[in-house]
A protein has these predicted regions:
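N-terminal loops that bind phosphate or other acidic moieties
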Residues: 1-192
């Protein structure tokens, strides 16, 4: 992280690749917020009703068996998360330590944002949500973090797709801000 900051990077995006990661995310977000499996579990990659029922059972069983401490981000991560969630959490914390922005992607990176917030509450000040995922608990999760999505494209992907789109929107907004003439400059130039 420090090397990238030295190279001039100030904005980072996080996302993940995998199958069934929304199951872990549901467990983690459920643990942090004292939500049961029905409240927090969604369809992921658009699974059937039968698979959703099974997924809800798995999430509730994981919550019941592991009894992760909702006040301890590392405990929740260790008991209910996985390597990819640890990596995203590390990026969020590293960026915040360097006063850099991290744009989180969907439901899965939101779970990592909860871990980061429990480890260092200040990390939330350096987070931007990108999009609203299709997971039923995503909006409510963002609200718990004090974040709002900027785009809603019905995305079911977590590979930093939404975060990359949001980064481009941010880049365009900054370009317009930096390169547009002010009203005073336009009047002085005589242009309309």
């Amino acid at each position: 992280m420090e090397q990238k900051v030295k190279e001039g990077y100030r904005v980072f995006t996080v996302g993940e690749m995998g199958i069934s990661n929304t199951t872990s995310s549901a467990c983690m977000i459920g643990a942090f917020n004292h939500w049961n499996a029905i409240e927090v579990t969604g369809r992921g990659t658009n699974i059937s009703d039968e698979r959703l029922k099974h997924k809800i059972e798995v999430v509730q069983k994981a919550l019941d068996i592991n009894q992760a401490d909702p006040d301890d981000g590392l405990d929740v991560l260790a008991k209910l998360g996985g390597f990819e969630f640890g990596c995203m959490t590390g990026v969020i914390l590293g960026a915040a330590a360097n006063r850099c922005l991290t744009i989180i992607d969907g439901f899965n990176s939101t779970a990592s944002a909860f871990v980061a917030k429990k480890i260092s509450n200040v990390s939330i000040q350096y987070l931007m949500a990108s999009h609203l995922s299709m997971e039923q608990a995503h909006r409510r999760s963002l609200e718990k973090l004090g974040l709002s999505e900027y785009i809603d494209l019905d995305i079911r992907l977590g590979e930093a797709v939404g975060a990359s789109i949001q980064k481009k929107i941010l880049d365009m907004a900054l370009t317009v801000y930096r390169e547009s003439m002010t009203k005073e400059q336009v009047q002085a130039d005589g242009s309309n």
